[in-house]
Amino acid sequence: MSDEILNGAAAPADAAAGPAFTIEKIYVKDVSFESPNAPAVFNDANQPELQLNLNQKVQRLNDNAFEVVLAVTLTCTAGGKTAYVAEVQQAGVFGLVGLEPQAIDVLLGTQCPNILFPYVRTLVSDLIQAGGFPPFYLQPINFEALYAETLRQRSQGETSLADSEPAGNA
């Protein structure tokens, strides 16, 4: 089924089975860790400040497959200097066959990022520890609430996740 979905054709048996939501592939698209002020930053006694940026992008690959990228940038500063910047783009290819556009949109905006998030959390924590810093654990994110906010913004004229190329912020 995987090759058929990625190639844009659903197998006849799949069509008879009804709607389907499948995880075709989960992968790291991009990863970066920078600690521009190491090793001096390890001795900084200032309270660290963390800034988290979260972004979701959706790209239609064909009629039945979408790439969803969950991007996280975590910046830690201490004493006005950057301690580290960890950036992760975790991606997945998801098959959506026989679903209405609204159902596809909900899955892309809620379930797909929920599936990708544990991978992001682990990778961010591992990067930070490998950089010599105490672990940081991303707290759970309510993607349903973020999707509801996206719907509210969309009511002001934006398009759906399924209709767009790279689109959607979470």
Curated annotation (Swiss-Prot):
Keywords: Chaperone, Cytoplasm, Protein transport, Translocation, Transport
Signal peptide residues on this chain, from the entry's feature table: none
Top-level lineage group: Bacteria
GO molecular function per UniProt: unfolded protein binding
Classification via InterPro entries: SecB, SecB-like_sf
Task performed by this protein: One of the proteins required for the normal export of preproteins out of the cell cytoplasm. It is a molecular chaperone that binds to a subset of precursor proteins, maintaining them in a translocation-competent state. It also specifically binds to its receptor SecA.
PANTHER family: PROTEIN-EXPORT PROTEIN SECB, PTHR36918
Subunit structure: Homotetramer, a dimer of dimers. One homotetramer interacts with 1 SecA dimer.
Descriptive protein name: Protein-export protein SecB
